């Protein structure tokens, strides 16, 4: 499952097709859809100017058929992207997903359709402990991660709820020893 927080608050958009979610992430996944089936869980605030409108969400569901999209409404807590990722992970795991791709809504996925298989294979080699990630214009730390539900089983969340937003990437980069970090810099996940 891909888990993606998204908001249209504070943007000069009037339609869902103007969003980063539509124009960047979903279009790139549609163009270079991974070779394994995926479900994308999108977390949005119940009072979001665009996503809270059912007809707007249905536009996206109608335009993208290569993958399933599930919209998860959240209680508004502006700036707390960590809570959204953690809640989306709960939903995905409850529905039987083992692997969680933690992404932003403005990411372009790799053009290699097997990138997700490569990430999963690397995690399996480590008994699904740690993470796999691509390169996201940051040579110091990874910022978009594939985790197995084992991470949730151990910690109870993807990111510590106290973080809210800043330093959540740093947490995942620092929590695991190097041998459990599968940083595949040849696979670009760019924004």
Regions found by a protein language model. Name each.
Residues 18-37:
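Short, acidic, metal-binding catalytic loop of nucleotide-sugar glycosyltransferases
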Residues 86-99:
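Active-site nucleotide-sugar/metal-binding loop of Leloir-type enzymes
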Residues 97-108:
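Short beta-strand-to-loop acidic/aromatic patch adjacent to the donor-nucleotide binding site
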Residues 129-144:
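Short beta-strand-to-loop element that shapes/binds the nucleotide-sugar donor at the catalytic cleft/hinge
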């Amino acid at each position: 499952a891909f888990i993606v927080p998204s908001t249209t608050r504070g943007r000069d958009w009037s339609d869902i097709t103007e969003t980063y979610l539509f124009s960047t992430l979903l279009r790139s996944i549609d163009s270079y859809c991974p070779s394994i089936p995926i479900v994308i869980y999108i977390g949005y605030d119940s009072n979001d100017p665009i996503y809270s409108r059912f007809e707007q969400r249905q536009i996206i569901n109608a335009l993208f058929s290569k993958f399933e999209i599930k919209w998860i409404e959240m209680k508004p807590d502006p700036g707390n992207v960590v809570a959204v990722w953690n809640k989306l992970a709960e939903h995905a795991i409850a529905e039987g997903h083992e692997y969680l791709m933690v992404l932003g809504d403005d990411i372009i996925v790799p053009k290699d359709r097997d990138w997700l298989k490569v990430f999963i294979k690397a995690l399996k080699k480590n008994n699904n402990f740690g993470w796999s990630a691509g390169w996201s214009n940051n040579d110091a730390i990874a910022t978009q991660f594939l985790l197995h539900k084992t991470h949730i089983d151990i910690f109870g969340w993807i990111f510590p709820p106290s973080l809210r937003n800043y330093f959540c990437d740093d947490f995942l980069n620092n929590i695991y020893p190097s041998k459990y970090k599968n940083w595949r810099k040849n696979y670009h996940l760019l924004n």
